[in-house]
């Protein structure tokens, strides 16, 4: 009776075991820091990989987390595969007016933007975490951010032996995300270790 009831309601059981687990997401869709619709992406990945690959045998569980910004509230880097929204700033120094109180430097939580006295703004790319808060800070358009891209972490783990996932070397576009996730799952199926 229970199985027929949940089938009528479009639900499935069995979210445990050596398979793709239900996809988790932060509230980036409604969060002030969220850079994209995390719920929509999580739903898409959940349908394609949790529901669509439900019978795919894996050597161990495979967890996917979808994070809306570099705050990492859902801890994507501690999952088998984690996605983090990124907005990479493009600095146009020709538009910088060297304002006494640089709005970009004021809003940057990483202190990646600085204004040496009497000079134009300097952006330290190594300090920038691509949170996008600076995107519209400069009233003269010296800094802008393009479309949201995604940092992909692979191989993260939480528990007795913690491992921070390794970020892929390049950010990926939205349309590339499902293919990247699929390749990671298939690689894990072929070469992953049990336990």
Regions found by a protein language model. Give the residues of each.
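A generic structural motif
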Residues: 1, 30-33, 87-89, 119, ...
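A hydrophobic, small-residue-rich beta->alpha segment in the mid-to-C-terminal subdomain
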Residues: 156-195
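Short beta-strand elements
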Residues: 80-85, 150-157
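Cysteine-rich micro-motifs
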Residues: 128, 132
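Generic secondary-structure signature for well-ordered alpha-helical cores
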Residues: 4-7, 11, 47-54, 109-113, ...
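Small-residue-enriched alpha-helical segments and adjacent helix-cap loops
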Residues: 1-101, 107, 127
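Iron-sulfur cluster-binding cysteine motifs and their immediate structural context
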Residues: 101-123, 133-149
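Active-site lining segments that contact anionic ligands and/or coordinate catalytic metals
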Residues: 78, 140, 147-149, 163-167
């Amino acid at each position: 009776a229970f199985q027929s009831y949940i089938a009528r309601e479009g639900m499935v059981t069995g979210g445990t075991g050596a398979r793709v687990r239900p996809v988790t997401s932060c509230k980036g869709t409604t969060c002030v820091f969220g850079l994209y619709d995390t719920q929509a992406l999580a739903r898409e990945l959940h349908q394609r990989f949790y529901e669509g690959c439900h019978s795919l045998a894996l050597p161990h569980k495979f967890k996917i987390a979808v994070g809306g910004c570099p705050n990492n509230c859902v801890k994507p880097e501690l999952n088998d595969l984690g996605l983090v929204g990124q907005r990479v700033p493009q600095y146009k120094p020709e538009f910088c007016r060297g304002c006494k109180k640089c709005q970009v430097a004021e809003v940057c939580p990483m202190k990646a933007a600085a204004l040496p006295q009497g000079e134009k703004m300097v952006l330290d790319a190594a300090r920038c975490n691509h949170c996008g808060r600076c995107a519209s800070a400069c009233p003269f358009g010296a800094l802008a951010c393009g479309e949201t891209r995604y940092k992909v972490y692979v191989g993260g783990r939480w528990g007795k032996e913690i491992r921070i996932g390794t970020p892929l070397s390049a950010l990926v576009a939205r349309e590339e995300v499902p293919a990247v996730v699929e390749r990671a799952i298939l690689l894990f199926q072929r070469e992953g270790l049990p336990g």
